[in-house]
Amino acid sequence: MNNIVDTAIEAIVAREILDSRGRPTIEAEVHLLSGAVGLAQVPSGASTGTFEAHELRDKDKSRYGGKGVLKAVHNVNEILAPKLIDLDALNQELIDRTMIALDGSGNKSNLGANAILAVSLAAARAGAESLGIPLYRYLGGPLANLLPVPLMNVINGGAHASNNVDFQEFMIVPVGATSFREALRWGAEVFATLSEVLHDKGLLTGVGDEGGFAPNLESNQVALELLVAAIEKAGYKPGEQVALALDVAASEFYKEGQYVYDGRPHAPTEFIDYLGQLVDQYPIVSIEDGLHEEDWQHWQLLTQKVGSRVQLVGDDLFVTNATRLQKGIQEKAGNAILIKLNQIGSLTETLETIDLGTRNGFRSVISHRSGETEDTTIADLAVATRAGQIKTGSLCRSERVAKYNRLLRIEDELGDRAVYAGAVGLGPK
């Protein structure tokens, strides 16, 4: 015992809590000998990629419709905790590799990616707390000073809303701002103006899972027209000051080799042409999941067609997985990767995937999930990794705004050293 440092793990406790959709998720605390405590909560997705790490649910229909996470909680408290006690919280990789080895599967299906990630993030927070430094500095070192451009999801469709809009997210991107605080204000003003624009047209202003409006619209183009109108009415220049971004989530409407939108099926090449036309007609700077997660051939074609003009982000395509990203790099499919901690299930693997992308000219977009909590880790992660971009929903719902407010505090803390990524943080490298 004499060799145990005060940053050694003394206790780990997990519990079942609720996410922003009222569904169970897991929270973990990591306690160190020094008295430092790290707390982390794990999000959950609605439109999940086939190749994501396994989220363990109880499947006991008598509790939460089978969506409980007591098995994951048990796995933390009874299996992971005993093996992690006395490990140094500052050795993040050892902690994560130990948990991955204990799970023993390729996709964390035995213990659950949600169980492993909760401990992984809580350990990092405990480590930062023990050193008396913020999480972004703990993970990113002295160069962690780049505030990300927010891609703000203000119109929801697809799997994130109960409406007839095909694409999942229509986002505003304040590329022309000079600070994160200014970017956030611009976004909030456009969001408020969009509410007025929708109301004036007799459209619904109820919001979806991520806080964006979810009206029934005639087409995807109508959504884009509404955003341009709101940007202009708020007093900003579309493209120059506030640009647009899309999460197509094409895997959600891919049927038997065709893309079914606007009420009928379309061939992949026809759909690629359609996306190209949208880029021509609107100030779009980023398209996420423009094609199905296994349609590698047409991802190459899409990248050849518009990849020099816009950012093409793989979410379901890459699922924060270094192996799948390596394939994308080799096949020249896309030019950016969406980073979701719970897709891969540990902090170490997440950082490795970001590093692989950076070394190969792929930008990273740090992202929330549709089922979120008040946990703000992704805000710190975006600054720590100098990713330059973050997706954390709309300008309402406190589980979304919590991340924006955390970034405001980080910007204040950095003072004159803070740099806002702006337009340079987006697009193909």
UniProtKB/Swiss-Prot annotation:
TM helices/strands, residue ranges: none
Cofactor: Mg(2+)
The EC number(s) this enzyme carries: 4.2.1.11
Pfam families reported in the protein's UniProt record: Enolase_C, Enolase_N
Cofactor note: Binds a second Mg(2+) ion via substrate during catalysis.
Keyword Lyase applies: yes
Record CDD domains: enolase
Listed HAMAP family: Enolase
Protein name: Enolase
Lineage: Bacteria, Bacillati, Cyanobacteriota, Cyanophyceae, Nostocales
